A protein has these predicted regions:
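Substrate-binding cleft and catalytic face of glycoside hydrolase catalytic domains
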Residues: 45-69, 74-196, 202, 206-208, ...
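Extracellular serine-dependent O-acyl
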Residues: 135-140, 182, 252-257, 288-306
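Aromatic- and carboxylate-lined catalytic core of secreted/periplasmic carbohydrate-active enzymes
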Residues: 283-370, 374-377, 384-393
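Sec-dependent signal peptide recognition
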Residues: 3-11
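Boundary/entry segment of secreted carbohydrate-active catalytic domains
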Residues: 21-58
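N-terminal signal peptide c-region/cleavage motif recognized by signal peptidases
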Residues: 16-19
């Protein structure tokens, strides 16, 4: 019996160690929204080249009685996803610890010590349940903008509250699983208000209680228009990384835990071709930054079939599960993005963005270029992706 236990522990350790290396090319999922089984989510993610999934672990849905996780279809679905992500996709899922629970947090978020303690207990029980299965945790989601909370009870912008929540939750998870990689913030580098808030969090010492910063790089209402472009968005990520290094005196890993483009009929700038080139550019530029350890795109499948509803149309697959051009693109390039033997870099030379993929051993390289903020065609992308096979030929 002991030998079997040790074997399980060794296998779990090896899987987690393997899962923690290499670039994450992940995708967000919404179990329960699309009529899919847990197996289907992992199947579609695998089919289209993703090596991780990101999903909420809603506190309100897993604990209806104090201290007891519900025996429910929701929890069984999550159990399957978190238990099988590494074996199915190659890397651990990212588990988002969110949001409030009416038993403990009447306003939908923790605002005092007793409510923070209840959230910490939920996080600790979650870490115990998935130790050896889940490596990545995100503490809350988009606190500053109040996602998941009613508009009348938007969480306070007081940095002390979120910092204290992070501090206590970080310590509790690490006590259970020292190997866990814990992300915080959901910071939008394009948003001046988010950067201001992050600086206030840093003043409170929050960087001592995280392993990485999670970032969401959507276009923000208070951002300049250039940040709508991949070039502009990644430039803002560069500025964020520089600021973090200056404030902390050390390197801090960044994980893009949400990024996406909604393909709606009423927006002439969100055609399938436009989104394809934006996804491709963003992928190339993000992979060229060594401090960006991964990206979870938002999201796997459209959340509805109303082509005029922005929130329905972020999927890489349509609501009927047929693939968009972006899904086919990820499918074609994912193996190169995840290959540790291939290094991507980018630079601007003679008013052109030049991305270089290079085999670290053979030094064989392939370049792709475009005019900053200019268009690239599907055929140009296909040609470049096809050329990358020469980097892995032996």
């Amino acid at each position: 019996m002991l030998n079997n236990y040790l074997k399980v522990m060794v296998v779990s350790c090896l899987l987690i160690c393997k899962s923690s290396s290499a670039f994450i090319l992940g995708i967000g999922i919404h179990p329960g929204n699309n009529g899919l089984s847990a197996q289907d989510y992992l199947k579609y993610a695998q089919e289209y080249g993703f090596n991780s999934v990101r999903t909420d672990f809603f506190w309100s849905r897993i604990e209806n009685r104090q201290g007891i996780f519900n025996d429910s279809d929701y929890l069984r679905t999550q159990d399957y996803i978190f238990s099988n992500s590494i074996s199915s996709l190659g890397k651990s899922a990212l588990l988002v610890l969110d949001y409030g629970n009416r038993i403990y947090t009447p306003k939908g978020y923790p605002e005092n010590q007793s409510e923070i303690s209840a959230y910490v207990n939920y996080a600790s029980r979650t870490a115990k349940r998935y130790k050896g299965k889940v490596l990545y945790y995100e503490i809350w989601n988009e606190w500053l903008q109040g996602t998941g909370v009613s508009k009348k009870n938007k969480p306070t912008a007081d940095p002390k509250i979120y910092t204290e929540l992070v501090k206590q939750t970080y310590k509790a998870i690490k006590a259970v699983d020292p190997n866990a990689i814990i992300m915080i913030g959901s910071i939008n580098p394009n948003s001046p208000s988010y950067i201001k808030w992050l600086n206030r969090l840093i003043n409170e010492g929050i960087l001592d209680y995280c392993d990485a910063i999670s970032i969401h790089t959507y276009f923000a209402h208070d951002a300049p228009l250039v940040s709508k472009t991949p070039e502009g968005a990644v430039s803002n990520i560069d500025k964020l990384e520089k600021m973090l290094k200056e404030r902390s005196g050390r390197d801090i890993d960044l994980y893009i835990t949400e990024m996406g483009y909604s393909q709606t009929e009423k927006d002439v700038y969100s055609t399938s071709d436009m989104i394809l080139q934006n996804v491709a550019k963003f992928m190339f530029l993000a992979k060229s930054r060594p401090f960006i350890k991964g990206i979870w795109w938002y999201d796997l499948i459209n959340d509805g079939d109303d082509r005029t509803n922005k929130e329905h149309n972020f999927g890489f697959l349509y609501y009927d599960k047929t693939p968009k051009k972006t899904a086919r693109y990820i499918q074609s390039i994912s193996s190169y993005m995840m290959d540790d033997s291939i290094m991507f870099s980018s630079q601007i030379i003679d008013d052109k963005v030049i991305v270089t993929a290079r085999n670290k051993t053979t030094q064989v390289s392939k370049k792709f270029e475009w005019v900053p903020y200019g268009s690239i065609t599907e055929s140009e992308l296909d040609s470049y992706v096809n050329s990358l096979s020469s980097l892995t030929d032996h």
